[in-house]
Amino acid sequence: FLGDSGIGKTETAKYISSCLGTDMVRIQFSMQQTNSAYQYIFGADHGEDSLARELIRRSSNVILLDEFDKVSPSFYNAFYQMFDEGTFVDANYSVDVSKCIIICTTNYRTEEEAEKYLGTPIYSRFSKVIIFNPINVDDKLRIARKCYERLIAQVNAEDKALIENNSILSFFERVIKEG
């Protein structure tokens, strides 16, 4: 998924996972710049959390590689194997991900920009590229209304009292319009 930050790429991945009725494993690469992140991806000592253990435990059908444009090229080999062979291998486990939907999000706006910065070897492994266009004010308002309606429904389903208050929605609308 290509497009500006905040336009719904991650939410779309969550929605896909929800529609499939499965868990989603999310790796947010903006936070994966440390040695502990490297150990998480490629396998820590037995007993510690790792991506492979999480994939095994959750048997997820959706893997979200969020903000993939921020990944260190040192991680690419693991993803070549994942994309090419449908297998994720770390220091301790081998996990079949051939039936998983693997979604990468980036803040690149065009295919050319993504290929230039990610490099052809990794970019050519994506089977489909979807570009998210910038969201206009009307779209933001529509999204805010849907989120508000979802919140009301969720609270009502939990038998908690929430007074529907149009001033809340008006506040959201004002923030969106004024920035």
Name each model feature, range by range.
Residues 47-51, 67-78, 83-139, 150-151:
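Canonical AAA+ ATPase core
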Residues 19-46:
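AAA+/P-loop NTPase substrate/partner-engagement loops
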